[in-house]
Every structure is written in structure tokens, then in C-alpha cells.
Amino acid sequence: MKQLTSAQIRQMWLDFWKSKGHAVEPSANLVPVNDPTLLWINSGVATLKKYFDGSVIPENPRITNSQKAIRTNDIENVGKTARHHTMFEMLGNFSVGDYFRDEAIEWGYELLTSPEWFDLPKDKLYMTYYPDDKDSYNRWIACGVEPSHLIPIEDNFWEIGAGPSGPDTEIFFDRGEEFDPDNIGIRLLEEDIENDRYIEIWNIVLSQFNADPAVPRSEYKELPNKNIDTGAGLERLAAVMQGAKTNFETDLFMPIIREIEKMSGKAYDPDGETLSFKVIADHIRSLAFAIGDGALPGNEGRGYVLRRLLRRAVMHGRRLGISDAFLYKLVPTVGQIMESYYPEVLEKRDFIEKIVKREEETFARTIDAGSSMLDELLANLKKSGKDTLEGKDIFKLYDTYGFPVELTEELAEDEGFKIDHEGFKAAMKEQQDRARASVVKGGSMGMQNETLANITEPSEFLYEAETAESRLSVIVADDARHDSVNSGQALLVFEQTPFYAEMGGQVADHGTISDAAGTTVARVVDVQRAPNGQALHTVEVEGELVVGANYKLEIDHSRRHRVMKNHTATHLLHAALHNIVGNHAVQAGSLNEQEFLRFDFTHFEAVTPEELRAIEEQVNEEIWKATPVTTIETDIDTAKSMGAMALFGEKYGKRVRVVSIGDYSVELCGGTHVANTAEIGMFKIIKEEGIGSGTRRILAVTSREAYLAYREEEDALKSIAATLKAPQLKEVPNKVASLQEQLHALQKENATLKEKAAAAAAGDVFKDVKEANGVRYIASQVEVSDAGALRTFADQWKQADYSDVLVLAAHIREKVNVLVASKSENVHAGNLIKVLAPIVSGRGGGKPDMAMAGGSDANSIQDLLSAVAEQF
């Protein structure tokens, strides 16, 4: 049997099938494109659906690939089994209506056993087949396989509901009796017993029938065009061909594990405890590839999967004694292992490292407290003799410390404890109920949830109206329903209303309510949604309001129009962010007020000034195109087929509103918008900032507020121009540049004077030479204005033979700066400063000849200087 690297196995696979007339299909992105049914690409055939369903006809009906894939349905098993991974490579060969069973089996056997190819021992190969599939049995016999190596298995039939289906034949490699401690032998295969002896290395699916759940399998009709779909795990083949005990001991994982050994100072022992090494090695592969393919850690969907993987790996790093961020340092190793076929990991190394490191640092800020709490909880359980971690405690870990529930469960189970899932769900629901209640109780509503929950009278929002005549159906005041009210504050429900209730980031309308005589009887100061969906108008009562009477409702037209401008501009901003920053920049929150708009979005670094300028310009270009804004109501499926952007976390009914701004922006939105982008007038970004892990915020203004913002900047510029005595604004940059040149010249002159002063002071410092164990050293506290002056001292010290070692300390702006320089081969400056720095509550490091450190305890400077002699 050949000893092949994983790269050689992959290439040999592709070369073999290419020699059989197959086209090599490149590995697709892990993030599915135009396939909402998949979270990740999870198999080799997943990217070829377009061929098998007939929507696209391949140029060549014979296809081969090596496809990266992610499956995360049972993450907790990673590291506990020999072959389970979250990311893996599936080698495949496919026939779309071309060759079938005979060629698939014959060529497969040739690839596995031919000396020219994999050269696996024939006596080590076993095949399972569907009992009624005599054709596959006979074909294996024709290839020379012994009947005793062909095992009929009833489950060897692939089908998922109605549609293409067929028998499959699986190929296993026998690793020998050492992996069969109970000497069960071939029954391991016959009875489908989980084992490490017979390893499945390949599955050939013969898509032959059209499955019909209404009839017995024996009555399935044959497909007019039969297909072949196969999958062989690269990791498993590598383990077999490299003689590895598990997949983790192959060249796909061991370089990563070796790096983890260096970081942890612990050795990986295949016969000992290896779980944490395996988990980290597996998860960093998934993280590196997924982030490289555009997925980012977050709180939902793919992002949550990545965040969960990262946090699980970090926790296992801590088990190995690694407390600092370390996963990002493994990214280059992952890239180097896979470079021959997947160069993109190294190409995107900086970006991937940045994302991983930032996530690690964010998690580290809460993990210590959470770990301590979990340890304490488990210790208390042991003392009390209980075996279940309570749901309220799991929720506190989740809510306060950011511990994923799955991670808490895993760590608890490792210690032999169960967790209370139902209790956790109850605690989560309580929090959600409190959050909903706080929205109802807060602001101007001031009512208990029970009162509002009992309102069942219907209320319709009139999108196109700004005034309406409507019947008053509910009055709530002082925590109770009333038939009438004539003063104070109240909540009103009308059968119909033009008032928009705050929702989707758009603030509520304000306005007035008048009686039949035209007298204003109430002013609307807020509108919120009641628990049953009605619009609750919070009003300041100025006259009598009576249930059952009709009133004229009129919104503040100016306020509504200003809010609409900002809301439509928000849609333009969202589209511009996609175009300029990337599709990962999706909405994480928004607020559309009358004075400004605020937009939160997912992104892992500050948007650059150049990007902000481009975004601003693009939004304004769309405004000045005077594009009509159209709104239609349709069903959710039609909306999605239009390409409408649905915001994650928003709940949509069967009917939705789609807001389109030409071809530039299409979003699902229940808010109100201008009829034409020209109404917005102008758009200006005021500020961009970070507000949390992976979330940025843009504050912007439109229309009159944008003009005022530009005028404010112009006024400030004119003031600067007057100060600089620049007759025209365009001369200000030159004037500022001239001032900067003068400043730099003065700074340079000042630095020269400092150097001279330091040189003069150095003369006294360098005279104070002491000796300890044959090492001449200078240890002194100096008065300097910055750390750079310490380096100046060191540079002068190097010019003459004053001593072997120089140690300087300075108290600069409430901090301690320490420098160590060495000319002695026996004294490493970096090592020496690591010993001295903690004395002043600091840390540092450096090279053998020069090292720096910072600290905070100025009172201990003399202790540090006194300790120098003890180090020689």
C-alpha cells in the first residue's frame, strides 16, 4: 500500500477521474449561493444540484471534484470519535445521465487497488450492498472481489421522500484485529456495529428509481436517465494510507496539533487524553475556511455556528493552559497545509486572523467570570449530591457571561452532570416576556401588560392617509378602561387610523384629534403596538373623549415627511453598504427620527474615510436620479423571488410589503416612504462608530438637516480661515500645511535640545557603575519627558565601554518606563526585563541587546533597581 500525503491523494483522485473523461469541478464556496435550503455546503453533490435537477445541463456529464464541506449537527462529538469533523473534504465522481453501475464499480475498484493509483490491498477491502441489488453484487464479483467480502445490508438504499432514489454500495477498509478488541470480526459490518476496525472510505449511490412513498420499493419505476453520485472522505483515506490511528494523526491535522503543543507546553499523546487538541485542530480549520469564504461570527445563522465553534475551541485551549488569544496564530498553519488546492486561506490570512483574534479577545473579557461561576455551580452540585444544573443558572451563564448553552452542557456533562433544558427555556421566556412588557410599560404608555392584553377591538392602519374620520373604540387611563375621559393622559384605540405606530426602526407619528365641531380634544404624543396588534395612541387630553364617538385624526404632516425622507435614505444607505463594504454588512438595527437616521450594521472594522465618502456619494447619486419609490403588497415567496432583502430576526406574515427604489434597493418593509428619491434632497454622514462586537453604527442626516450640517462645517472653516488670515477658503489647506511644517521644525529643534540635555545628564548616570559576580552594571532612575529619551541614553551608552549592562527607570506621566540594554553574552536583556518588570506591576520583553517594559507602580522603582544585582 502506498504512503501518500493528503495532497497526493486529492490530486490522484482528480487525475484518475480526469483520465476517465471527467471534468474537474472546482471546490465551491462554503456559503451556498442561491440555495436558501442550506446553511453550509455540506456534501460534494450539494453544489451540483443544478445538474441533477435538470435546471442546468453540464458541458460534460462526467464530473469529479474535491469539495470542502461543513456539517455541524453534532459538534459535541468532534474529538470524541476518531473520524468526526465539522469541516471535511468530500472526494466525488458523478455521472449525469451518462455511465452507470458497471463503470462506477469497475473504475472505483481500479482506483483503489491498481498499483498505478492507490494500490490498497484487495484483501483489506469489504463492500456492502442492498440485498435486492444483485447487479452490484455480480459486478463486484466480476472485479475479483471474494463473496465473503460482500455484505448485504438492508439500509443500503438512498431516498428522501418522492424523487430520485436507488441502492448504494459502500466500501470499507479492514484495519485489522488490533482495532477489534472483542474479536467480533465481520459481524461488525453485518450488524452495523460502531467500530474502528472496518472504516467506510467510499459510498457509491446508484440513482436508479423514482421513489413513490405510496407504493412498495419493489414497485418504484426506473428513471429514464440514471445518475451516479459518490463520496469518499479525504480525511478517512488519508488515515488509511498514512497508517494513522485516527484522522487526527494525519498530515491534515498533525501540523496544527504540533503548533498547539508549542503554545500549551503539553504533549499530544495518541494513547492518552487528546480531546482538546482534536477539538481545536478541527474547529480552527472550519473557522479559517468559513471566514475566508465570507461567513462572519455573529448571533444568528452561520455566524452563530462560527461563534460557537470559536468559543468551544477557546475553552479547550484553556483546558490546555492557554489563556491568551491563540487561535488566530493557527490560521497560517491551516493555510499551509491546504495551500496546494486552497490558496485562498493564505491569500486572506490577514483578514481571517483579524476576525478570529477579535472574537477571541471579545470572548476573553467575559469568560473568566463565567468559568468561575460554572466551576462554583458544579462544585456546589457535587457537595449537595445533585446531578442536574438548574435552568436558571444556565440562563445566567448565557445571559450575563455569553456562555453558549451547548458549551455549558458539554462542560457539565464532562463532569458527569445533566442540565435542565426546560428550566433554561422557561428562564429565557421569562426574560422575553419582561422585555415585551417593558416596551409596553415604558415611555408614554405607562400601563400594565394585563390591561393592554385584554384589548381585542380591531384597528386598521391607513398607509396612504394623513387624515381620517374614525370611531373611538377603546379608552385606557389610570390602568383601567373608561367610557370617557376629559383630562390627563390616556391611551386610545380607533377603528382606523392614519397614525403610524413605532415599528421597524421608524418612530411614531404625532398629531391631533378633533371632535365634530373641529375643536382639538387631544394631542397624540406617541403610538405603539398593543399586545394584540392595535395602534395605541398615547394622548394628552384637552377636551372630552367618548367611546363610540367619531373623531378627526390628523398627523403632523411635516414630521411624517421628514421621517419618511430618513427612512427611504436608510434603504439607500443599506444598499450602498452592500455595494462598497460588502454583502456581510447587513442591518443590525435602525432608527428613523425626523432630525436624523441611525443605522447599525454588521462589520468587523471601522469603515474607512474613503469608504464613507464613496457611500455618501453613491446615496446622493441615487437621490439626484429622482427614482420613483414603489411599494407593493404580495406574498412572502413572491417577495423573495423579487430579490427583496428580508432582515434576519424580523417576523413576516403571509402578506408583506416590498419597497423598491428602482433596481438599486428592494427590501421587505412595513414603514412609510417618500414617493421619489428627489424628495430626500441631500444625504450626509455625520459619524461612524463601533457599538459592539462586529457591529458598526452610522449617524446621518438628510434634506434641511444635511444642508445645516454642511453650513456648520463651512462656518467653522471660515472661522479657521479668518484665524489663519487666509482670504479664501481654498487657501486654508496650504496655510495649515505651512503651520505643520513650522511645528515639525520646532519639534525637531526641541528634540535636538533634549538629546543635548540627555547627553549632559548621561555623563553623571554613566559614572555610577557597580559590579556583581563579574558583571559591570549601571542601574539608575532618570528624569526624562518620554520613553524615547531612554533610548537616547542607551544609544550613547553603546558608544563607549561604560559597563556590561544598563538598567534605566523613569516615572513619566503616572507610568513607569524601564529600559535594559546589554553588551554581555551572558545577560539577555529581554529575559532580564521580564524578571524586573513585575516589581513595578508591569510587563515587557525584547531582544538580547535591548528590551523595554511599562509598569504602574512608581513607588517600587528603587526596589527594581536594587534587584538588578541579584540577577547576575
Curated annotation (Swiss-Prot):
Catalyzed reactions: tRNA(Ala) + L-alanine + ATP = L-alanyl-tRNA(Ala) + AMP + diphosphate
Location of this chain's protein in the cell: Cytoplasm
Cross-referenced InterPro entries: aa-tRNA-synth_II/BPL/LPL, Ala-tRNA-lgiase_IIc, Ala-tRNA-ligase_IIc_anticod-bd, Ala-tRNA-synth_IIc_core, Ala-tRNA-synth_IIc_N, Ala-tRNA_ligase, Ala_tRNA_ligase_euk/bac, DHHA1_dom
GO biological process: alanyl-tRNA aminoacylation
Class of enzymatic activity (EC top level): ligase
PROSITE patterns: AA_TRNA_LIGASE_II_ALA
Cofactor binding note of this UniProt entry: Binds 1 zinc ion per subunit.
GO CC term, one of those recorded: cytosol
Cited Pfam families: DHHA1, tRNA-synt_2c, tRNA_SAD
Annotated binding of Zn(2+), by residue: H567, H571, C669, H673
E.C. number(s) listed in UniProt: 6.1.1.7
Main location: cytoplasm
Keywords: Aminoacyl-tRNA synthetase, ATP-binding, Cytoplasm, Ligase, Metal-binding, Nucleotide-binding, Protein biosynthesis, RNA-binding, tRNA-binding, Zinc
A GO MF label: catalytic activity, acting on a protein
UniProt remark on domains: Consists of three domains; the N-terminal catalytic domain, the editing domain and the C-terminal C-Ala domain. The editing domain removes incorrectly charged amino acids, while the C-Ala domain, along with tRNA(Ala), serves as a bridge to cooperatively bring together the editing and aminoacylation centers thus stimulating deacylation of misacylated tRNAs.
Family, per entry: Belongs to the class-II aminoacyl-tRNA synthetase family.
Function as written in the Swiss-Prot or TrEMBL entry: Catalyzes the attachment of alanine to tRNA(Ala) in a two-step reaction: alanine is first activated by ATP to form Ala-AMP and then transferred to the acceptor end of tRNA(Ala). Also edits incorrectly charged Ser-tRNA(Ala) and Gly-tRNA(Ala) via its editing domain.
Name this polypeptide is given: Alanine--tRNA ligase
